[in-house]
């Protein structure tokens, strides 16, 4: 990141610091196709709205892990970019697939690298048992993230959790020695000591799975171009990295592969956007392109409601942790969708304390809460619709993978008022075929197989 920033400075690139994109400016052509004309951004320092008229827009806005209480994601990762695209009627793809990293600091979600297990750290339950030997006898603690996360939660649910509330397991690094921990895994020692008061050199660290990475997002092709349906390109918008769904990770990303994703598709998106604007024309701006955002902000700022932003956000995150996390069922997903509907009604009555314009973070948090509610509902609705278990999506009531019916991508579209009580009234789910590579004989190069460890 530092290298990237230094090169931007060297090239004289202008940064609009503390500007938050809140809307994608779109217009329809004569055939009803979506065209992009730029973005509307909110300047936090002044409270002013700015219209950026552009031929192309690149979304690199990160994920939406803050729909969950326990997450490794930063506080700003509320899915604003993904939500902006969704509200414009463009689809989101495979939104139900979310990766939960096994080793987050218990109760906090701060990530402890799986490099620790790569160095030989061991997961243990309350009795000190190396429980992964029971679940994945060949690779034990080095099993894929989704499997390890489920095993950890299962240990807790079956009463083998550690701590006064029996709600976590241990990451045991004590046998690695101080030199390995201090030189190869310095973040683990620093985080455990700072946030839990635990010294990994001498005692095991309490850990539990943490919401880490959204496999789904804004659908793109390998050029980074945003797709309007299965394969139709929307001229102008591009997306890359955590907010995008180019589908190189399938339903279950492998560790560190997101870094490769960022480098490859970030570069492709940038290069292709530059190439596109060389020949493209500006799409004329609609009259008063900032009107919708202005009305939304003023409505929130002037609302005389009594609901607190923090209370609504906390309720949403806790309910998503309880009902749509590592394990999911028809009942839990239906429950959380009911909660989200109730929260939407309460959101209409939300109170913003700060009525000013300069650095009004209270107002911005209210906007972010709206995006969180949108995305949490889509995740739960798509997860309920996929009645199987695959990768980062585990249904306890449908524990097996069902390739015959569900070897396909979910495409979610906004089709009505998101405040309507039934998601079916405003969310349309469709399917997109999975692309298989085949050899000259017409056989699959990589036929689907059951994972066994």
Language model regions located:
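An anion/pyrophosphate-binding glycine-rich loop and adjacent beta-alpha core
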Residues: 84, 90-206, 272-278, 318
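Short beta-strand to alpha-helix junction loop
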Residues: 1-6, 16, 71-79, 104-108, ...
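Flexible, glycine/charged-enriched surface loops at secondary-structure junctions
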Residues: 12, 18, 92-96, 164-167, ...
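Glycine- and aromatic-enriched mobile tails/lids
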Residues: 27, 124-133, 137-142, 147, ...
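Core beta-strand elements of the Rossmann-like FAD/NAD(P) dinucleotide-binding domain
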Residues: 46-56, 233-236
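Feature captures the FAD/FMN-dependent oxidoreductase FAD-binding
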Residues: 1-43, 49-53
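Glycine-rich loop(s) and the adjacent beta-strand/alpha-helix scaffold that form part
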Residues: 56-110, 255-272
């Amino acid at each position: 990141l530092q290298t990237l920033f230094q090169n931007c400075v060297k090239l004289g690139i202008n940064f609009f610091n503390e500007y938050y994109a809140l809307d994608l400016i779109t217009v329809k052509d004569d055939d009803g196709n979506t065209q992009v004309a730029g973005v509307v951004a909110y300047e936090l320092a002044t409270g002013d709205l700015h219209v950026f008229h552009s031929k192309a827009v690149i979304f690199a806005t990160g994920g939406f892990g803050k729909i969950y209480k326990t997450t490794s994601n930063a506080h700003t990762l509320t899915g604003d970019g993904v939500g902006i695209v969704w509200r414009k009627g463009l689809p989101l793809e495979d939104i139900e697939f979310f990766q939960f990293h096994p080793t987050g600091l218990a109760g906090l979600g701060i990530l402890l690298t799986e490099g620790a297990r790569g160095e030989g750290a061991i997961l243990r339950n309350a009795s000190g048992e190396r429980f992964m030997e029971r679940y994945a006898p060949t690779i034990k603690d080095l099993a894929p993230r989704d499997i390890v996360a489920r095993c950890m939660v299962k240990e807790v649910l079956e009463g083998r959790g550690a701590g006064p509330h029996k709600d976590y397991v241990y990451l045991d690094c004590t046998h690695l020695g101080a030199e390995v921990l201090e030189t190869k895994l310095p973040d683990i020692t620093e985080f455990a000591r700072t946030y839990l008061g635990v010294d990994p050199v001498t005692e095991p660290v309490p850990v539990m799975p943490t919401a880490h990475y959204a496999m789904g997002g804004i659908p793109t092709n390998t050029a980074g171009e945003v797709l309007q349906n299965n394969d139709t390109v929307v001229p102008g918008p591009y997306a890359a990295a955590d907010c995008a769904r180019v589908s190189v990770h399938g339903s279950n990303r492998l560790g560190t592969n997101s870094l490769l994703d960022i480098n490859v598709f970030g570069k492709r998106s940038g290069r292709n956007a530059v190439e596109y604007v060389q020949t493209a024309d500006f799409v004329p701006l609609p009259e008063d392109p900032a009107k919708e955002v202005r009305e939304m902000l003023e409505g929130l700022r002037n609302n005389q409601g009594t609901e607190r932003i923090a209370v609504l956000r906390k309720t949403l995150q806790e309910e998503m942790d309880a009902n749509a996390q590592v394990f999911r069922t028809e009942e839990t997903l239906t429950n959380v969708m009911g909660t989200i509907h109730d929260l939407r009604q309460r959101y209409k009555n939300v109170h913003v304390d700060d009525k000013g314009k300069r650095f009004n973070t209270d107002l911005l948090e209210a906007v972010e809460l709206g995006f969180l509610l949108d995305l949490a509902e889509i995740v739960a609705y798509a997860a309920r619709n996929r009645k199987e278990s695959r990768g980062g999506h585990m249904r306890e009531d449908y524990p097996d993978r069902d390739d015959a019916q569900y070897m396909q991508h979910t495409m979610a579209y906004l089709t009505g008022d998101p405040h309507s009580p039934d998601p079916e009234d405003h969310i349309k789910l469709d399917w997109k075929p999975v692309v298989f590579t085949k050899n000259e004989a017409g056989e699959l190069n990589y036929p689907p197989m059951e994972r066994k460890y």
